[in-house]
Amino acid sequence: MKNRKYFLTIMLLCILSCEKDFLNVVPDNIATIDLAFNNRATAERFLSTCYTYIPEHAHVEQNFSLLAGDEIWYYAENDFYMNNETSFRIAKGLQNSSSPYLNYWEGGRGAPHSLFTGLRDCNIFLENLVSVPGLEEEERQRWLAEVKVLKAFYHFWLLRMYGPIPIIRDNLYVGASLEESQVPRNSVDDVVDYIVELIDEVIASEALPGIINYIYTEQGRITLPAAKAIKAKALVLAASPLFNGNTDMSELVDAEGNSLVNQVYDENKWVLAK
């Protein structure tokens, strides 16, 4: 019994004297955000990731404006291809709120990604690009401008689909409380103002090219005319009868009772859109 007590005492002393940080070690080969921005090549791959969220305009499934209306009808009901196009199902009156088609809010049902995930990656890029070593300042400014335009475009696409949406200026930190995570929706005018703000910053920076000079390596990259086109589309949408004095949306208000859609027609919106 005495030997047993000695043994337990020694074991207890060994445990208490162990290095406290022995198990507090990050395993090797674990990817971190720092690794994505520790050189130009990895940062450029992250830039490409920010681009991957762009919906395909020419894709009949991903672009709701092609088949979701009643401008185009396909009469062969037994055609396998058309019966499986989610946008065509919207035109047939099958859209629903519990499991919506073309769900760019969460991703799925014809939408390859959540655009809010795209906005999160854009914010990560903007927050970390400054730390990339060996990157020419001219190229850094161009990449920043491109991702700002992507942020503006993703906000515009969500606005066009859902009306008032939350503005995602910055990412929430991982330890955010429940209250901090419940981001309220902003008004249509606020969202459009933010889109214009981002594009105006890009225009003022003069960082974007007017045309793509190297087609084989830069085809599809954002140019200055593309950025201005997004701004114009956003301003026209804000000036349109849908969001400019539309009293049918008078009950669309925030938690404080503020209207999320402009209830008084404003002619100046068309002046801004010209």
Question: Where does each model-flagged region fall?
Answer:
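Polar, glycine-rich mid-to-C-terminal structural blocks
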Residues: 237-239, 268-274
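Amphipathic alpha-helical protein-interaction segments enriched in hydrophobic
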Residues: 220-230
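Short coil/turn linking the two alpha-helices of tandem helical-hairpin repeats
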Residues: 159-160, 166, 237-246
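Membrane-proximal, proline-rich intrinsically disordered regions
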Residues: 18-69, 253
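A solvent-exposed, charged loop/short amphipathic helix patch at secondary-structure junctions
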Residues: 245-265
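Conserved, well-structured interaction surfaces
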Residues: 44, 48, 52-62, 82-162, ...
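Extended amphipathic alpha-helical segments enriched in small hydrophobics
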Residues: 151-152, 231-233
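Bacterial Sec-dependent N-terminal signal peptides
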Residues: 1-28
